């Protein structure tokens, strides 16, 4: 069917079941926006006040919907404004497809008005980027972009499209499948290694599971809960893994790290086998990895082989999708008991006391604790960056249906308000709360307009 590339771009989004896009128009992306306007009954446009906030809104939408979300910007400063949001998504492995306009093909490299090398500028922060110069490549590029963004270790993909290309007329047909010879993520775990991992967990006297954000990325929340329950292994999380495991579960022992809770950190120091699932184990999670490696057998599951051994050595590395690997493990799992070990961990935290604030003041820890008690179970809490993030992570008690979103890797202030908007649009049935400090609020409060 003949149509313009802009119209074909809209058809690509429809084929990928995109219902909402977040962005801000400008001259270099106007042909695409005109086509979107004609499709307003199928795709809702959310007009943000700054391009990075469109990226953050797409970030929140992707986390709750579980599929790649779309943000749009024009060329030059519009595209460069988007880089912080791209880097934020990359650091936390969030699947977003970023579409930017570009100057006409014959003007690229001439330093014309609002020209910026966005593919080069964003290169460190994307899984892949495209400069779409051949109109006939439109369908293939979009199919690949959504596939790359949402598979393997998720992340942002950038498509930069010159204005003249958007206006070109092509014969459009969207491919049903995507085959990229150089990109084939390992999803299922090596069976021999899975058996070794299970043997190590069965032999352990003081096993401990550490959950990272990769469990959310793999949609493996139920699988990790089931395995932990069968084998009765206590659970801790990194910041990005918070809310995978409900706080009221007897196996849950809190967040690890510099800003974590005493009980979780003490458990790491005493365990004999540490089972890392989808966790990067960055500097805020484990300060002294070399010391831990000497005393503890470490099992590390991650879909990205580059993460295994990067920050902490692994005795038993296992590359694969957390959901599929955990299913393999559950099939082999035997019911076990670690009652004494779990009871001991519960004594390591000491008694947590709240100091009632003086009249006319607010204790933020008390505030967040009380907020958690008043909110419904199926709440999405979006924490910004700063001390408010730490208070939320340590004081908010999530129930099974709850979900925490935050910028854990990049630590991007101003994230919470637009991300909460995106999260709410992904699932309107969920209560959604943004928790932020005054500085972060002033960076993105205009999105409430």
What does each model-found stretch correspond to?
Residues 2, 19-20, 63-74, 79-100, ...:
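Structural signature of the thiamine diphosphate
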Residues 24-26, 45-56, 71-78, 133-134, ...:
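Active-site nucleophile and cofactor-binding loops and adjacent substrate-binding regions
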Residues 6-14, 18-19, 27, 32-37, ...:
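Active-site diphosphate/adenylate-binding microenvironment
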Residues 2-87, 91-92:
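N-terminal cofactor/phosphate-binding cores enriched in small/glycine residues
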Residues 29-32, 53-57, 77-86, 90, ...:
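Short glycine/serine/threonine-rich phosphate/pyrophosphate-binding segments
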Residues 99, 107-114, 270, 308-311, ...:
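Thiamine diphosphate
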């Amino acid at each position: 069917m003949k149509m313009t590339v802009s119209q074909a771009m809209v058809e690509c989004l429809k084929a990928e079941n995109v219902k909402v896009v977040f962005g801000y128009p400008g001259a270099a992306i106007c042909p695409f926006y005109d086509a979107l306007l004609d499709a307003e009954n199928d795709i809702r446009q959310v007009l943000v006040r700054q391009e990075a906030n469109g990226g953050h809104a797409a970030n929140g939408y992707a986390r709750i919907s579980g599929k790649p979300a779309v943000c749009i910007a024009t060329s030059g400063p519009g595209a460069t404004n988007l880089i912080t949001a791209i880097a934020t998504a990359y650091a936390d492995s969030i699947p977003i497809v970023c579409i930017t306009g570009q100057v006409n093909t014959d003007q690229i490299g001439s330093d014309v008005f609002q020209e910026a090398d966005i593919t080069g500028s964003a290169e460190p922060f994307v899984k892949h980027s495209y400069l779409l110069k051949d109109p006939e490549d439109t369908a293939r590029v979009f199919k690949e972009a959504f596939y790359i963004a949402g598979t393997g270790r998720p992340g942002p993909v950038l498509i930069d499209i010159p204005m003249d290309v958007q206006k070109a007329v092509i014969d459009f047909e969207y491919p049903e499948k995507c085959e990229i010879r150089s990109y084939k993520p390992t999803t299922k775990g090596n069976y021999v290694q899975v058996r070794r991992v299970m043997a190590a967990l069965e032999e352990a006297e003081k096993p401990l599971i550490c959950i990272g954000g990769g469990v959310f990325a793999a949609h493996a929340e139920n699988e990790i809960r089931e395995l932990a329950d069968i084998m009765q292994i206590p659970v801790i999380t990194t910041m990005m893994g918070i809310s995978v495991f409900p706080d009221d579960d007897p196996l849950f022992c809190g967040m690890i790290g510099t800003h974590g809770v005493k009980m979780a950190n003490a458990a790491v120091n005493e365990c004999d086998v540490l089972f890392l699932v989808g966790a990067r184990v960055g500097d805020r999670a484990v300060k002294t990895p070399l010391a831990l490696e000497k005393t503890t057998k470490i099992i590390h599951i991650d879909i990205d082989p580059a993460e295994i051994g990067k920050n902490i050595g692994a005795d038993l590395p296992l590359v694969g999708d957390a959901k599929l690997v955990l299913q393999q493990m559950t099939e082999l799992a035997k019911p076990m008991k670690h009652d004494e070990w779990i009871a001991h961990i519960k004594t390591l935290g000491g008694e947590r006391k709240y100091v009632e604030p003086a009249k006319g003041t607010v204790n933020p820890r008390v505030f967040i604790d009380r907020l958690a008690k008043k909110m419904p179970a199926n709440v999405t809490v979006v924490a910004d960056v700063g001390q408010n993030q730490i208070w939320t992570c340590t004081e908010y008690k999530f129930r099974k249906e709850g979900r925490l979103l935050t910028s854990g890797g990049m630590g991007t202030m101003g994230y919470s308000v637009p991300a909460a908007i995106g999260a709410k649009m992904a699932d309107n049935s969920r209560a959604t709360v943004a928790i932020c400090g005054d500085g972060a609020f002033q960076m993105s409060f205009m999105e409430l307009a």
